[in-house]
Regions:
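Central antiparallel beta-sheet cores of small beta-barrel/beta-sandwich binding domains
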Residues: 20, 27-110
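Exposed beta-sheet edge/beta-hairpin loop segments within beta-rich domains
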Residues: 7, 99-104, 111-116, 128-131
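A short, Trp-centered hydrophobic/proline-enriched beta-strand micro-motif
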Residues: 15-19, 121-123
Length: 145
């Protein structure tokens, strides 16, 4: 039997809830956002991975977003209205992303996703603009379904 492709990505199947905490270079909180994230593997044409996100901001406003990942051999490729880039995984189950922002010229972020135990995961985003780090985002989530 052949092993399933992208096992570290597949480990994130399900619905996740938690927080996204944006912090500045001095580790001061800029914003704390409540998150609801659905990770799916729909097996539709080229779409290998689909993520749907609902973010609730401190002022009560809600942002909905979603994106698909296309299998490109050793990585998944993303091309959305706000970013373009790829994800891949390490041999020991860490998922990495490098995404160029379309909505912020000169900006990109690198994301590290680490699966914990008991249905928990940690994600960190390192934001760069014109080559300089300017923000980090700390995502703490738990699987709810």
């Amino acid at each position: 039997m052949t092993a399933l492709k992208f096992p570290a990505h597949r480990a994130h199947l399900g619905t996740w809830e938690g927080t996204y905490r944006h912090i500045d270079l001095l580790a001061q909180e800029e914003e704390l956002i409540q998150s609801h994230v659905v990770c799916e593997f729909p097996d539709l044409d080229d779409v290998f991975y689909r993520q749907t996100i609902t973010l609730t901001h401190p002022d009560g406003s809600i942002t909905n977003a979603g994106f698909d990942g296309i299998d490109r051999g050793d990585h998944l490729w993303f091309d959305t209205p706000t970013f373009i880039g790829k994800s891949w995984e390490t041999a020991d189950g860490v998922v990495l992303l490098n995404l160029q922002r379309k909505d912020e010229p000169g900006a990109h972020f690198v994301e590290v996703i680490i699966m914990g135990e008991g249905g928990h995961r940690a994600r960190t985003w390192h934001w760069f603009k014109h080559g300089q780090l300017y923000r980090r985002t700390l995502c703490d989530e738990r699987r709810v379904a």
